[in-house]
Design a protein with these regions (language model features):
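Glycine-centered hinge/linker elements that transmit conformational signals in sensory
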Residues: 19-28, 58-108
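Short, solvent-exposed loop/beta-turn-alpha elements that line the ligand-binding surface or hinge
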Residues: 10-14, 40-43, 67-88, 153-160
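Short helices/loops that flank or line small-molecule/ion binding pockets
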Residues: 23-28, 111-127
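Extracytoplasmic/periplasmic substrate-recognition and gating elements
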Residues: 101, 137-171
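Beta->alpha turn/N-cap motifs
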Residues: 53-56, 129-134
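Surface-exposed patches in mature extracellular/periplasmic domains of secreted proteins
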Residues: 7-15, 34-48, 105-109
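Periplasmic solute-binding protein
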Residues: 1-9, 51-74, 164-171
């Protein structure tokens, strides 16, 4: 309510939850709040548009329709990194996550101040996380919701979510 944001659930229902829509929200969530920079500090005041971790980018790539493997004319698996959609999605995601304050990779293996705790503390508008992370959000003061990773653009026919023990969704 504080930011007068578009409802992500409605964006999903309308097929308008895209990388551009997510980025618009991310920009609204970034604020120094008196800090000198967006360098992470557990006791800092800066807020971020989106805090994620390593597989969060994979979730965004898959959501944007990028495929790591596709089938050839004989229905055999082939590497798809040279596919135009993969390049387009990777390029757009790279530009989104390279903006200071709008995205921060807060990987547990590199930093003990894990992305889940930053989200729980209200230091980020959104995160890309595993469903299991929601168990740590139960007593949060802020409301949150769960939506699929965004589509590349509105012309993409459906939302894609991958499933593995480490699969991430947008929260």
């Amino acid at each position: 309510d504080e930011y007068s944001l578009e409802d992500p659930y409605q964006l999903v229902r309308d097929g308008k939850w895209t990388l551009d829509a997510m980025y618009s929200l991310m920009k609204l969530g970034a604020s120094l709040n008196g800090d000198e920079s967006f360098t992470w500090s557990a006791d800092g005041a800066a807020t971020y548009g989106h805090i994620g971790w390593d597989t969060g980018v994979t979730a965004l790539l898959i959501g944007a329709g990028a495929k790591y493997i596709k089938s050839d004319e004989n229905n055999l698996p082939v590497i798809a990194f040279e596919d135009e959609q993969f390049y387009n999605a990777a390029e757009k995601i790279a530009s989104i996550i390279s903006q200071p304050g709008e995205y921060l990779d807060l990987n547990k293996n590199q930093n003990p101040d894990h992305y889940e705790m930053a989200f729980r503390a209200g230091r980020t508008l959104m995160t890309t996380a595993q469903i299991k992370a929601t168990s740590k959000f139960r007593d949060m003061e802020d409301d949150y919701g769960i939506v699929p990773p965004p589509k590349y653009d509105e012309s993409q026919s459906e939302y894609y979510v991958y499933t593995t023990p480490l699969a991430a969704v947008c929260i």
